């Protein structure tokens, strides 16, 4: 999927109390911008119908006269209810129309909407919600959990620093209707479906209104007006919200004079509703039992929710608690977080009321880029280029192995066997000839042999990885992520490459080369398995190794005099004095002199049997492919 520079990503945070809209371009990485609607960046989630002006939203819906059916607080999972889906559709359609008319968005195929929902909403509710949003004018819409948006916002805004990225983080999103908790570990959501679906700042709005009505001098009349004209009740509740926000913007400011507003209801005669909050009054409200919270207070319920989150996180307690959502501006929420999470840093996001909208736009952009990124990675992995890269480097590996065998077999197999013959532990040259093969097998299978071969494979593998990275670097550049994020990790699952002789791979000694030893030790074991070919030196016995054995026997024969029949001499048990006629240093010198020829014969034997290594090629490519798949899973967390 190619990145279309013209695609607009709209993050639409339809809140219970307020709504915010953010815009991001698919081709960019900058922070999404908050779009204003009718000059305001935070839109009151309210909708009404006017006899001449049609559908009104936000403050316009509240302030206009002669409106009918003023609806507020209509975000709910109960989408089948008329008082939920009707105002929701009207509100969304109006916001989209305004954005189109003001040319804030283009619309059509180039505008993609990403709308948030509480993490606790079921998949069925989300599908129904998306359907309603499409009816509201969002032709291309995706519903994302707000927990995902909160995580992306926290990452992109810099609240999750590099030193915190590996630790646990708790994001607390306090909205008007719900409080959602998102536990993050290694930049991935670990827990997101816990919180308080009924605990939101809107409950305090209702509590303030209820107390205002109960203390009003014309209480009965006011209750009757609200019953007959719900629009007035909605207006007063919204004013209660504004007074609450006024109070929490600076609680100390209202110690002597209460935060207050007055509402004039256009009744005959007019009725005034005075809404006032003092520190004492707010403290009483916070501790008042609420029916919506099963008789518990807002303060107590929030603290219990924090304690529940702490318990759910278990041993992985957060290093950072990030507060988002407009209701997080209530300072006591951060104080309670500090009481419960004593070891964590407590941070309230800048402009918390816009966090989810920005997070939705960023998450949408990341999701689309991630799809394109995975498609490009998959295209590379299925192209055969990885296998071709390994195949091109195989001759270099065979040369390294040939050099290793030429020296190793001479030093660790032939010379020790010669010493044993010279001292009489091996009776005849025929026995010496017969013992070379099992000694070669034993040395190649030993820890010493494997470790020596691993040094060779290390050099080869180190030369292979840059060739692989040349294939992946262009993809990293396209998506602006570090090259190292899409590279082969130090461990590959190579055990399935070929049958490895039992006991050959000692998992306890696989760290002798550091992390890379995990790969090269297994690769070395596979190479040894191929060389031994069913327990014998199948690739070497008849050619290279036979050449080396013949060299030693020939030296012994020459030391005893010309004309001696080699076949006869092989079966003779020579006296110790005769065996001493040829020194170990002479044999060692001859082996060194013939090493290049021996190495060439081994290289030819290996290269002539390259088809035997086909499954090594295939499985090496498959293992690198699997490793890159895993790297891609982590790399997507870096896409912005």
At which residue positions do the language-model features occur?
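Glycine-rich phosphate-binding/hydrolytic loop that grips phosphoryl groups
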Residues: 46, 146-158, 205-207, 347-384
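Phosphate/ATP-binding catalytic cores across multiple sugar-kinase/actin-like superfamilies
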Residues: 2, 88-106, 147-160, 285-318, ...
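Gly/Thr-rich phosphate-binding beta-strand-loop-beta motif of the actin/hexokinase/Hsp70
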Residues: 2-32, 158-191, 360
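Acidic, glycine/GT-rich loop-and beta-edge segments that sit at the periphery of enzyme/chaperone cores
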Residues: 16, 219-226, 230-231, 358-526, ...
């Amino acid at each position: 999927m190619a990145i279309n520079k013209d695609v607009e990503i709209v993050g639409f945070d339809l809140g219970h109390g307020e709504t915010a809209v953010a815009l991001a371009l698919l081709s960019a990485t900058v922070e999404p911008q908050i779009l204003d609607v009718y000059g305001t960046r935070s839109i009151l989630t309210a909708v009404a119908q006017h006899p001449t002006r049609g559908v009104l939203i936000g403050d316009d819906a509240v302030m206009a006269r002669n409106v009918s059916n003023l609806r507020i607080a209509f975000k709910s999972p109960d989408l089948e209810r008329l008082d939920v889906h009707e105002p929701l559709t009207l509100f969304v359609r109006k916001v989209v129309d305004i954005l189109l008319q003001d040319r804030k968005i283009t619309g059509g195929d180039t505008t993609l909407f990403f709308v948030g929902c509480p993490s606790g909403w079921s998949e069925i509710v989300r599908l129904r919600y998306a359907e309603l949003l499409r009816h509201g004018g969002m032709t291309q819409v995706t519903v994302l959990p707000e927990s995902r948006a909160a995580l992306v916002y926290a990452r992109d805004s810099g609240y999750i620093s590099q030193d915190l990225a590996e630790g646990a983080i708790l994001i607390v999103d306090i909205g008007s209707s719900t409080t959602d908790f998102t536990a993050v570990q290694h930049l991935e959501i670990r827990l997101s479906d816990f919180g308080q679906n009924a605990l939101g700042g809107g409950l305090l709005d209702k509590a303030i209104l209820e107390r205002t009505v109960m203390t009003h001098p014309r209480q009965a009349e006011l209750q009757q007006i609200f019953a007959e004209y719900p629009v007035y009740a909605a207006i007063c509740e919204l004013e209660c919200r504004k007074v609450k926000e006024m109070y929490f913007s600076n609680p100390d400011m209202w110690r002597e004079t209460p935060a207050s507003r007055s509402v004039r209801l256009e009744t005959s005669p007019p009725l005034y509703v005075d809404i006032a909050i003092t520190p004492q009054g707010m403290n009483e409200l916070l501790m008042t039992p609420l029916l919506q919270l099963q008789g518990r207070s807002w303060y107590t319920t929030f603290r219990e929710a924090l304690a529940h989150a702490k318990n759910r996180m278990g041993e992985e307690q957060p290093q950072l608690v990030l507060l988002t959502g407009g209701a997080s501006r209530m300072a006591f929420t951060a104080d309670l977080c500090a009481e419960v999470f004593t070891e964590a840093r407590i941070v309230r996001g800048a402009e918390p009321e816009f966090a989810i909208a920005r997070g939705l736009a960023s998450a949408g952009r990341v999701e689309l880029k991630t799809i394109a990124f995975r498609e490009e990675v998959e295209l590379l992995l299925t192209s055969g280029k990885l296998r071709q890269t390994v195949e091109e480097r195989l001759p270099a590996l065979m040369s390294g192995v040939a050099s290793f065998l030429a020296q190793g077999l001479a030093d660790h197999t032939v010379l020790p066997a010669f010493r044993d013959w010279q001292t009489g532990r091996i009776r005849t040259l025929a026995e010496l000839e017969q013992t070379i093969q099992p000694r070669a097998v034993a040395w190649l299978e030993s820890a010493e042999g494997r470790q020596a071969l691993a040094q060779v494979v290390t050099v080869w593998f180190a030369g292979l990885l840059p060739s692989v990275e040349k294939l992946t670097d262009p993809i990293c550049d396209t998506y602006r992520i570090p090259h190292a994020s899409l590279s082969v990790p130090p461990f590959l699952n190579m055990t399935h490459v070929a049958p490895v002789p039992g006991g050959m791979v000692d998992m306890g000694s696989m760290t002798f080369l550091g992390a890379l030893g995990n790969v090269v030790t297994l690769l070395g074991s596979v190479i040894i398995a191929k060389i031994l070919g069913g327990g014998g030196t199948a690739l070497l016995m008849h050619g290279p190794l036979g050449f080396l054995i013949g060299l030693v026997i020939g030296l012994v024969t020459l030391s005893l005099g010309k004309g001696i029949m080699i076949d006869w001499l092989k079966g003779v048990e020579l006296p110790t004095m005769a065996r001493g006629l040829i020194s170990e240093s002479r044999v060692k010198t001859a082996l060194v002199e013939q090493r290049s020829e021996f190495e060439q014969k081994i290289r030819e034997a290996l290269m002539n049997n390259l088809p035997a290594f086909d499954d090594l090629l295939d499985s090496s490519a498959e293992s690198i492919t699997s490793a890159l798949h895993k790297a891609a899973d982590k790399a997507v967390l870096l896409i912005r």
